[in-house]
Amino acid sequence: NGHYYHLQKAKQEAGADFCVAVISGNFTQRGETSIVNKWAKAYMAICGGADLVIELPTLYSVSSAENFANGAIKILDSLKIVDSFAFGAEADELATLNNIANVLYDEPRGYTNILSHELKKGISYPMARENALMMYLNDIKRYANVLGNPNNILAIEYLKALKTQKSHLEPIMIKRQKVYYNENRIVDGFASATGIRDIMKRKQY
């Protein structure tokens, strides 16, 4: 499945001697109880190729993408044995995600002015931020496709967290394969988390 592919691809891309996985525990980023307990998730991660599994504290795992990412980077940096950080995304290029992360980190005046103008329209902060980024980067079509995807949003926050924490970790983007976020189907053995949960609920395994 996707996580197994991610683990193997990450180790390959990094030329890693070992792999550390930081995963949420019994509660997910949506604030819901995980469909399997944290011990089962850790066991599956080890079976998939991880050498060490560390729980992302609930304080981070149920929080925003920004806090989720900051927690993960903080843990990996604190180990002093990790030099690369692999994350999943649906974007085609790491550079595209980095462009956005740089704006969010630097907060240039042009961007903040547009953001302030968008917020005055009464729209939500996430929507105002998305609009401001697209207008500031001057490529609405290109960045709309990136910013409209939850996996990309988390990837951007990881990249921003690396900058915020002045981390030495080298970012490695693993492109999502076959099935996109929230797709309820299986393609060549790949399924989204939503699809897997649905299969388990319907006991079609």
PLM features: residue spans?
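N-terminal catalytic cores of NTP/NDP-binding nucleotidyl/phosphoryl-transfer enzymes
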Residues: 1-38
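A glycine-rich helix N-cap at a beta->alpha junction
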Residues: 43-57
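Receiver (REC) domain switch/active-site residues of two-component response regulators
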Residues: 17, 51, 83
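Glycine-rich loop at the start of a catalytic domain that most often binds anionic cofactors/ligands
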Residues: 32-43, 67-70
